């Protein structure tokens, strides 16, 4: 009986710890996305914009490993699909930056914020 109880307690704490680590990892990725989105919009030169976009892409790519719970009954894209869309928009903005079109890239970057807002609307975080 003691072994069963001990095993149950250990399993519970392992599950709780893994959930906490996952939430912290996702939270860190979301903070990195937000911080670098702001840096991208404030960038005065292509190098700063490219660095911010690269950091955003890394955070979005890393975030794909987390499967988020939908908080609506509406049919919505998976969290992985939303992160894929964000990555596509980041790549489009990066192409514009590399072509010397920083202002146009910032306009393109607004779609990233729209996707972020959509994700926050549909997913628990």
Map each language-model feature to its residues.
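Short, charged, amphipathic alpha-helical segments
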Residues: 50-56, 76-84, 105-113
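Short, solvent-exposed, charged loop/turn and helix-capping segments
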Residues: 60-80
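Bacterial N-terminal signal peptides that target proteins for export
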Residues: 1-9
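Sec/Tat signal peptide C-region and signal peptidase I cleavage site
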Residues: 17-23
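N-terminal targeting signals for Sec/Tat export/insertion, comprising classic cleavable signal peptides
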Residues: 32-62
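Surface-exposed, polar helix/loop patches in the mature regions of secreted/periplasmic/lumenal proteins
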Residues: 87-125
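Generic L/I/V-rich hydrophobic alpha-helical segments across diverse proteins
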Residues: 30, 53, 60, 83, ...
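Cleavable N-terminal signal peptides
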Residues: 8-11, 21
């Amino acid at each position: 009986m003691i072994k069963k109880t001990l095993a149950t307690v250990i399993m519970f704490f392992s599950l709780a710890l893994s959930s906490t680590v996952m939430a912290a990892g996702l939270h860190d990725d979301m903070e990195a996305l937000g911080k670098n989105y702001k840096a991208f919009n404030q960038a005065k030169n292509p190098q700063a914009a490219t660095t911010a976009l690269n950091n955003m892409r890394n955070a979005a790519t890393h975030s794909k490993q987390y499967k988020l719970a939908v908080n609506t009954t509406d049919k919505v894209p998976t969290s992985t699909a939303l992160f894929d869309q964000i990555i596509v928009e980041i790549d489009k903005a990066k192409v514009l930056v590399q072509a010397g079109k920083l202002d146009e890239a910032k306009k393109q970057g607004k779609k990233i914020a729209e996707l972020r807002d959509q994700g926050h609307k549909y997913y628990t975080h």
